[in-house]
Amino acid sequence: MSYADNVFINMCKDILENGTSTEGEKVRPHWEDGTPAYTIKKFGVVNRYDLSKEFPILTLRRTALKSATDEILWIWQQKSNNIHDLHSHIWDEWADENGSIGKAYGYQLGVKHQYKEGMMDQVDRVIYDLKNNPFSRRIMTNIYVHQDLHEMNLYPCAYSMTFNVTQKKGEDKLTLNAVLNQRSNDALAANNWNVVQYAVLMHMLAQVCDMQVGEMVHVIADAHIYDRHVPIIKELITREPKEAPKFWLNPDIHDFYRFTRNDVKVEGYEFGPQIENIPIAI
């Protein structure tokens, strides 16, 4: 059984069995027909993945690796806030007539800040510290910038990464670990999507910094299942998980800004039937 499937199944069961409902409360999200999008939610969900043992992609249904990678590179590498730079239409609902989502996501990672070592944006600061001061406890990014929230077409869901490097006994290479903080996570539409893309990011950064990957800890303040997703989730978690596939990252690339969506793949990826036309709350 894929470990990622096991984590997902247990999380969804916990939400369904022990979560609380927002039905009847004042909620922002709504369905396309204007109906309020209520959820069953759990506070403070923490999921751990050891990337050195397994790539955390679901086999219950397919997670689109290249599209997920394209999105994380759009944010972290291109530092873009324009959906025209993407190969998918996931963000279309939040873009203006020019394709911009405002001062959100990639925009924030591209803002340069003054450090003692010079002007750098947050991504370059992370790479600099991982290479030059790997045991620092200050290696992190944060894109939830309050002064710019009014100019964001949507607030960041996954908003912070904290990196931590360890030296395992008997290992020559350092190990890169990270905590992904997320204020809100849609279990069906976004959970494994986010897990996969940040796992890819960690693999890329580890390779660039001559490290090996370790643990990724996913901290979710509000993990939820939307009311119209409940029957879909109930069916999904009854499926038989398959073995986890092997992750491949182009070993010839050692510059983070040279990676493309074509430099990643999963080998031996078997998965259950895809779920079509998932309703998305906006």
Region spans (language model):
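Terminal, non-catalytic protein-protein interaction segments that mediate quaternary/complex assembly
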Residues: 1-282
